[in-house]
């Protein structure tokens, strides 16, 4: 990922293909790599000219970035600023593949195709919301990757928050991409920043037995393979409704569920 010579060779190869075929091809760079490699890849793609289409009239070049995006808020913001300097916003796709799963897409269909639910899909009708993603399997051969990440960054700050935003979002004015993203973003902005005392009182983390003996895992690792967080939303629709986020590996069963407790 670090050597820019490889990017130059790739640019030359793609240019030869376009010339040979007499076309200006579309180019999509999909990054599903550990977060420490993003910076070098972004820079090398830009400096080698791979981010520029071969013609202003036809062909496009885009970059897709997968989770995890940075190690924390600071590094994620730094990477996003770098993306903005090296690429046009129209070229950038920040992807969470979990949104493509049928279970996730069914949340939207269930919520907004049943008009009778709308009046009670709020704090008046729902007493509690739980977002749970449990996996029966352990980390498998992902030790080197997972041990530097943990459950919260692997699935909590992306998959579970996407499920939460879909479950709690208000009805969009239109069912297009921009409108859906706008309503999901409102939910995420309503999440409070937990203090150290909040974390002690309302969060749990754990590690399954035998994790430290997994391949490529540090024997003294404190990386969590399980977490549970209770939080809430600071908005009028869901004010006062407890929200539970939970995920873990090597659990008794595999399941993805968004149970809600209806007020009686």
Cite the ranges covered by each PLM segment:
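Secretory/organelle targeting and membrane-embedding segments
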Residues: 1-65, 69-264
């Amino acid at each position: 990922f670090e050597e820019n010579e490889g990017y130059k060779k790739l640019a030359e190869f793609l240019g030869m293909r376009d010339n040979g075929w007499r076309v200006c091809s579309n180019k999509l760079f999909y990054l599903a790599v550990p977060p420490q490699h993003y910076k070098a890849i972004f820079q090398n793609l830009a400096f080698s000219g791979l981010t520029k289409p071969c013609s202003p009239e036809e062909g496009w070049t885009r970059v897709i970035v997968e989770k995890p995006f940075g190690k924390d808020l600071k590094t994620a913001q730094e990477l996003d600023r770098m993306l903005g300097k090296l690429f046009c916003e129209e070229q950038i796709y920040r992807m969470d593949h979990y949104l493509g799963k049928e279970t996730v897409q069914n949340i939207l269909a269930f919520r907004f195709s049943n008009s009778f639910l709308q009046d009670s899909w709020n704090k008046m009708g729902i007493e509690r919301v739980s977002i749970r993603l449990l996996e029966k399997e352990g980390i498998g051969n992902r030790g080197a990757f997972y041990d530097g990440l943990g459950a919260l960054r692997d699935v909590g700050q992306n998959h579970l928050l996407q499920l939460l935003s879909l479950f709690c979002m208000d009805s969009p004015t239109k069912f297009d991409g921009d409108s859906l993203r706008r309503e999901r973003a409102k939910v995420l902005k309503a999440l409070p920043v937990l203090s150290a005392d909040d974390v002690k009182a309302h969060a749990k983390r754990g590690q399954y037995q035998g994790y430290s003996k997994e391949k490529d895992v540090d024997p003294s690792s404190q990386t969590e393979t399980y977490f549970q967080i209770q939080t809430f939303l600071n908005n009028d629709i869901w004010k006062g409704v407890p929200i539970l986020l939970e995920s873990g590996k090597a659990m008794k069963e595999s399941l993805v569920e968004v149970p809600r407790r209806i007020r009686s």
